[in-house]
C-alpha cells in the first residue's frame, strides 16, 4: 500500500507525521470518497511529485475516475483561485469593482457531490493559505449542513499532508547531498 511507502520514507524526525498520516488514513469522520479525494487534492496542492504518485496509487483503486479527476480539478482550480483571491484581498479593496474574468466551471459542475468538492477545495485552500477561499468554502459547507467535525477533519488532513510533503522534500534533498 502506498500510504505505507510514504510512512516508510519519512525520516525518524518526522515520526509524528508518520503516526498522524496513519491515523488520518483510517478516519471515520470522512467518507471514503471524501478522504481519498482530499488526500489526492492536497497532495497535488503540495507540488510534491513523490507524494502525489504514492497517494494516487492507492486512490486510483478506491475512487471512481470521476472522483479522482474532480480531486485533481479541485487542486488545479484552487491553485488559480487561491492566488487570485488572496492577492485581491491583500490589496485592500482597490480592485473589488473589477470582474475576475476567470473560468471556474468545475466548481459548479465537479462530477461529484458538491459537498465533497467543496471539502477538497477547503483543504487545498488551507495548504495555499487563502483566507478568503477558506471562509467561502467553509460557509458553503456549513450552509449545506456539513458537520463542523467533518470540516475540521479535512483541515487536519491538509495540515498532515503539507507536513509530510515538507518532510519528504527535506529527506530527498539531504539524500542527494
Curated annotation (Swiss-Prot):
InterPro entries tied to this protein: AhpD, AhpD-like, AhpD_core, CMD-like
Annotated S-S bridges: 130-133
Catalytic machinery residues: 130, 133
Catalyzed reactions per annotation: N(6)-[(R)-dihydrolipoyl]-L-lysyl-[lipoyl-carrier protein] + a hydroperoxide = N(6)-[(R)-lipoyl]-L-lysyl-[lipoyl-carrier protein] + an alcohol + H2O
GO molecular function: alkyl hydroperoxide reductase activity; disulfide oxidoreductase activity; hydroperoxide reductase activity; peroxiredoxin activity
EC number(s) per entry: 1.11.1.28
Matches recorded under NCBIfam families: ahpD, ahpD_dom
Known partners and oligomeric status: Homotrimer.
Family: Belongs to the AhpD family.
Its biological purpose: Antioxidant protein with alkyl hydroperoxidase activity. Required for the reduction of the AhpC active site cysteine residues and for the regeneration of the AhpC enzyme activity.
Protein name: Alkyl hydroperoxide reductase AhpD
Species in which this protein is naturally found: Mycolicibacterium smegmatis (strain ATCC 700084 / mc(2)155) (Mycobacterium smegmatis)
Amino acid at each position: 500500500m502506498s500510504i505505507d511507502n510514504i510512512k516508510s520514507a519519512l525520516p525518524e524526525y518526522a515520526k509524528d507525521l508518520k503516526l498522524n498520516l496513519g491515523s488520518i488514513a483510517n478516519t471515520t469522520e470522512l467518507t471514503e470518497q471524501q478522504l481519498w479525494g482530499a488526500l489526492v487534492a492536497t497532495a497535488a496542492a503540495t507540488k510534491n511529485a513523490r507524494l502525489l504518485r504514492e497517494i494516487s496509487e492507492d486512490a486510483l483503486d478506491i475512487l471512481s475516475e470521476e472522483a479522482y479527476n474532480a480531486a485533481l480539478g479541485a487542486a488545479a482550480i484552487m491553485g488559480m483561485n487561491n492566488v487570485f483571491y488572496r492577492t485581491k484581498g491583500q490589496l485592500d479593496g482597490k480592485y473589488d469593482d473589477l470582474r475576475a474574468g476567470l473560468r471556474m466551471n468545475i466548481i459548479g459542475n465537479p462530477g461529484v457531490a458538491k459537498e465533497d468538492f467543496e471539502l477538497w477545495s477547503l483543504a487545498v485552500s488551507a495548504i495555499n493559505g487563502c483566507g478568503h477561499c477558506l471562509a467561502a468554502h467553509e460557509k458553503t459547507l456549513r450552509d449545506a449542513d456539513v458537520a463542523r467535525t467533518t470540516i475540521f477533519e479535512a483541515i487536519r488532513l491538509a495540515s498532515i499532508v503539507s507536513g509530510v510533503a515538507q518532510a519528504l522534500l527535506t529527506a530527498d534533498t539531504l539524500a542527494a547531498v
